[in-house]
Amino acid sequence: MKEEIDAPVSTDASGTDLENARDQPSGEKPTAVDIYLVEWDGPNDPELPMNFPLWKKSLITCIFSTLTIWVTFSSSVFSAAAGITSKEFHVSVEVMTLGTSLTVLGFTVGPLVWGPMSELYGRLKPLYIGYAIFIIFQVPVAVAQNLETLMLARFFLGFFGTSALAIIPGALADFWGPVERAIAISLFSAATFVGPIFGPIMYVNTMITLVNGVWTRANHDMSSGGFIVDSSLGWRWTAWITMIPASFFGIIAFLTLPETYHPVLLQRRASRLRKETRIWAYHSRLDENTPTFGEILTKYLFRPIQMLFLEPILVCMTIYISLIYGILYLFFVAYPIAFREVRNWKSLGIAALPFLGILVGVLMGCLLVTIATRLWYAPKLQNGSVVPEDRLPPMIVAAILLPIGLFWFGWTSSPSISWAPQAIAGAPIGMGILMIWMQGLNYLIDVYLVVANSAMSANTLIRSAVSAAFPLFATAMYHKLGVDWATSLLGFLSIAMIPIPVIFYFYGAKIRALSRFSPKW
């Protein structure tokens, strides 16, 4: 039973095919005699994705991560435009924050569609369809003349863009071994955070100012003088700037990516054999057992809801992961308040740069998870002593780092204190968010194994809904409480979450033994 831990390394945003992927890598023949059942010709079959050369696996992973960056980039790039667009459409800034929240809400609904599609049609078809429509929906955002068009387009680009977030982690599980896959997943995880962090930073060069009802070029001077941001584009370029590189890398993906989903590859092999031999009895397991609509609904909707009421591990981890993901999107509102309003930084370019502190923390967290996987997890995997709770030590460290970073950020926000300590506080915040997210999801996958898809669907549903809601109250909270106490409130909430990984590390095995869905170890 210990060998089953090989697969639980994906941090899939939707739980896409984590259950099926678990049985794919071995390449072994079935024991039952069926000479026309098409399977891999042993573990060394050259067509088995696990046998791709290292350069090919690395290239595919990099392309996947690039697609992910532009999807998540689109979720936050609009947040910096809330002030200007609120003036153009004559609504409050809080209303314009819906532009970000609706995209994240699309991330909530999308996996319920893209997960099942990847099981039926493979990785590439639904990925290409969703990603192409995601690109197309940048156009109505860029040319919208009314608020309704803008908001609907923002929702649908999130819905279709999440095809990448839902499908790619499962695809990585198709061709990476257990230890290497953890490293590949860490790269994908970093991409999911790099995108939204870069969004507000890249936006600053597209700002323009409304003067006497006419959009003009604007120079924003620092109060200290000397630094000028010459912004000649406009907020609509937040869509064009997303569309252009997303299209470029989408074309590269279309021309280079191979299908990796094992059941579909075997189905294609069976079809090829039927044509070559004229023996129509050749078939694959997918031909025998195509999931029914009812089975798909059970896996991605009904069972996840049931588990949210019955599984304490899933409930607690989902609450924790939802909190840290919500904090990330809340900061897209909080950072401009902290640096532009409180510190009176006039330049949007300068005010956006502190986001780089979170980015540095995300990359450091990615590195630490990789090191922990190599030095702690891999040896246990090799000697067969690994258990799900072995995922939690890095998460416990991150659970301590996150509140440290939050209190650090909040109580260095006074204009009388140098900006540097507050900007540096983003590093432990980024590390905490990345490591809690990665290891928390990995732990859920390890715990639930054969029903991991359902657990991840439940987590995704709640996590995305919470992260969509957080930006909506961020402005009011920070204006009412101030940066110090508003961020401290988040710090206190994160402190309240620290016992979750600690308790599961020591008592997780006993709790799992009482579960209806976790396999008995």
From Swiss-Prot:
Keywords for the protein's UniProt record, in alphabetical order: Glycoprotein, Membrane, Transmembrane, Transmembrane helix
Record-linked SUPFAM superfamilies: MFS general substrate transporter
Homology family: Belongs to the major facilitator superfamily. CAR1 family.
The keyword Transmembrane appears for this protein: yes
PANTHER family: MAJOR FACILITATOR SUPERFAMILY, MAJOR FACILITATOR SUPERFAMILY (MFS) PROFILE DOMAIN-CONTAINING PROTEIN-RELATED
Function: MFS transporter; part of the gene cluster that mediates the biosynthesis the mycotoxin citrinin, a hepato-nephrotoxic compound to humans due to inhibition of respiration complex III.
UniProt membrane topology term: Multi-pass membrane protein
The keyword Membrane appears for this protein: yes
Location in or out of the cell: Membrane
Pfam families: MFS_1
Region of interest called Disordered, as start-end residue ranges on this chain: 1-29
Glycan attachment sites: N383
Record-annotated disulphide pairs: none
Gene Ontology annotations for the cellular component aspect, listed alphabetically: plasma membrane
Protein name: Citrinin biosynthesis cluster MFS transporter ctnC
Transmembrane segment boundaries: 58-78, 95-115, 124-144, 155-175, 182-202, 237-257, 313-333, 349-369, 392-412, 417-437, 465-485, 489-509
Chief location category: membrane
GO molecular function, one term: transmembrane transporter activity
InterPro entries linked to this entry: MFS, MFS_dom, MFS_trans_sf
Species annotation: Monascus purpureus
